[in-house]
């Protein structure tokens, strides 16, 4: 039987799996949608957020962030930017995952000793760094850099490497 990964058929499915793994993180969801200074405060935000309701809204796999999106809640965009056949096993594919974090400047400051974009990046790493998701090998964190700065928002790009299994 031919490998589905070898022909890219499972790549989109795996991207959705990663997005859903991020949606399981309540602190990440709260950082994305609670736009006040204390987004994790259980007294002001006592309820859990239905993570799946944020798919394609705050956590996206379609790399589109409009001008309107730049002034509202923070967004995460997942993008596989590169893939290649694993040299030691041609049924596996080495993937490069980019996660872009878009945060309006008016939401950067939060209570505590950090800024919202870095709190979001920390929760992303807690969710997927060195983890395995069904059909994927270990997700390895490679680093981050500033991606975009506009008058309304700033964006950071995180890089991960993944070995996708057949």
Identify the function of each model-found stretch.
Residues 115-166:
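Acidic-leaning, charged glycine-interspersed low-complexity segments
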């Amino acid at each position: 039987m031919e490998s589905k990964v070898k022909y890219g058929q499972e790549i989109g499915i795996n991207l959705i799996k990663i997005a859903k793994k991020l949606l399981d993180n309540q602190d990440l969801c709260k950082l994305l949608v609670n736009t006040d200074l204390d987004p994790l405060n259980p007294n002001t935000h006592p309820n859990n957020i239905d993570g799946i309701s944020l798919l394609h809204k705050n956590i996206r796999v379609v790399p589109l962030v409009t001008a309107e999106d730049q002034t509202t809640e923070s967004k995460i965009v997942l993008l596989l930017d590169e893939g290649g056949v694993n040299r030691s096993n041609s049924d596996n594919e080495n993937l490069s995952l980019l996660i872009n974090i878009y945060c309006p400047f008016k939401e950067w400051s939060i209570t505590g000793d950090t800024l919202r974009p870095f709190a979001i990046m920390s929760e992303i790493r807690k969710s997927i760094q060195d983890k395995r998701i069904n059909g994927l090998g270990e997700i390895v964190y490679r680093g981050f850099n500033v991606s975009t700065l506009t008058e309304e928002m700033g964006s950071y790009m995180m890089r991960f490497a993944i070995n996708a299994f057949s």
